[in-house]
């Protein structure tokens, strides 16, 4: 009985941490499904295919960019509709590539954090970090938010 009293408090610490670790670890097939959505967006951008691009976003999705102007950090919000409109007028393919993506999944919520570089056609434009939030819906994984940074310096993987 005494050993049970000692074991119970220990289990209170072990069980929640094991469950948390398991929840954040993505099963290989779910990880692949989440990354496929991101890649589908980039394939759509390269092809300038607005229908394909629209298909990866949830209807409530929003895009945001962290920018610094006059030494002050701000968030620049862009509706998906404005992004799609710009894509429809692109004269060159938008070529974005990811490097070393980190995927976290807990139930129906997934996050992808990845470095990227961006080219207009074959010409380097900028690099940064993309942070995707995805929701698993009845239609599959959908992007509900995409935040990024963009810079021209310190881009080690731009070729």
Residue ranges and their predicted role:
Residues 41, 53, 61, 112, ...:
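Hydrophobic pocket/interface hotspot
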Residues 14-18:
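N-terminal signal peptide c-region/cleavage motif recognized by signal peptidases
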Residues 1-8:
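Bacterial N-terminal signal peptides that target proteins for export
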Residues 22, 62, 74-124:
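Surface-exposed, charged secondary-structure patches
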Residues 111, 126-154:
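Short beta-strand edge/turn micro-motifs at domain boundaries
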Residues 57-59, 67, 114-118, 147-148:
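A mature extracytoplasmic/lumenal domain signature
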């Amino acid at each position: 009985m005494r050993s049970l009293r000692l074991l119970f408090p220990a289990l209170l610490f072990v069980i929640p941490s094991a469950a948390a670790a398991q929840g954040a670890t993505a099963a290989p097939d779910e990880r692949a499904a989440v990354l496929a959505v991101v890649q589908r967006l980039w394939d759509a951008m390269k092809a300038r295919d607005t229908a394909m691009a629209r298909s990866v976003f949830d209807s409530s999705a929003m895009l945001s960019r962290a920018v610094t102007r006059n030494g002050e950090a701000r968030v620049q919000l862009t509706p998906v509709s404005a992004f799609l409109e710009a894509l429809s007028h692109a004269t060159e393919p938008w070529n974005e590539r990811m490097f070393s993506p980190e995927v976290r999944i807990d139930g129906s919520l997934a996050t992808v954090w990845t470095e990227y570089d961006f080219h207009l056609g074959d010409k380097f434009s900028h690099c940064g970090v993309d942070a995707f939030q995805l929701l698993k819906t009845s239609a599959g994984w959908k992007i509900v938010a995409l935040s990024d940074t963009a810079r021209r310096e310190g881009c080690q993987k731009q070729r």
